[in-house]
Amino acid sequence: MNRTIMSTGLRWLWLALVVLALDLGSKQWVMTHFWLGESVPVIPFINFTYAHNPGAAFSFLADIGGWQRWAFSAIAVVIAVVLLVMMYRSDKRARLSNAAYAMIIGGALGNLFDRMVHGVVIDFIDFYVGNWHWPTFNVADVGICIGAVLIVLEGFCRPAGKTASQKG
C-alpha cells in the first residue's frame, strides 16, 4: 500500500493539535492565575474553579489508591494509538469520523500530559444550574465528549452498508 499521509485520515491530525493546544494553554492560564480551589463566575451558569482530579472524566475513580494515574495513562496511550491507526486506514474524505478521532486524541493527550507532569488532571470548568453542579471538567474532556458524540452521529448518518474507511 503506497499511500501518502495526506491521502489518509491522518491529514486531520491538525485538529488534535488544536484541541491539545487549547487544553494545555487554558490549564496553564488557570494554574497561573488561580489558587487551587478558587472559583470565579464567568457567566450565570459557568464558573472557572481550579481543581485537581486524580481520576478520569467527571472524577471517576478519583477517591481510590493511586494506581488509576498509571491505568488511565496507559488507556490514553492505547486509545490514541488505536485511533491513529484507524485514521491512517481511513480515507481523508471520511471527515466526520476523522475529526472525531482527532478530537479524542487531542483530549486524551492533554489529560495524559497532566497525569504525567502533575500527577493529576487539571480541571476548571464548573457548569451548574441553581445549586446543582456538574463535575468540574476541562477542554480535553470537551474534545473527547464532542468526538464521541460525532462518532455516534456518524453511525446514524452513514448510508447502510458503507463504513467510514471506505473510499467514495
Swiss-Prot record:
Enzyme class (EC, first level): hydrolase
Catalytic site positions: D123, D141
Localization per Swiss-Prot or TrEMBL: Cell inner membrane
TM region positions: 5-25, 70-90, 102-122, 137-157
EC number: 3.4.23.36
Top-level lineage group: Bacteria
Keyword hit for Transmembrane helix: yes
GO cellular component, one term: plasma membrane
Pathway(s) served: Protein modification; lipoprotein biosynthesis (signal peptide cleavage)
Cited InterPro entries: Peptidase_A8
Record's bilayer topology term: Multi-pass membrane protein
Primary localisation category: membrane
Gene Ontology molecular-function annotations: aspartic-type endopeptidase activity
Record's catalysed reaction(s): Release of signal peptides from bacterial membrane prolipoproteins. Hydrolyzes -Xaa-Yaa-Zaa-|-(S,diacylglyceryl)Cys-, in which Xaa is hydrophobic (preferably Leu), and Yaa (Ala or Ser) and Zaa (Gly or Ala) have small, neutral side chains
GO annotation, biological process: proteolysis
Family, similarity comment: Belongs to the peptidase A8 family.
Name the record gives this protein: Lipoprotein signal peptidase
Organism of origin: Sodalis glossinidius (strain morsitans)
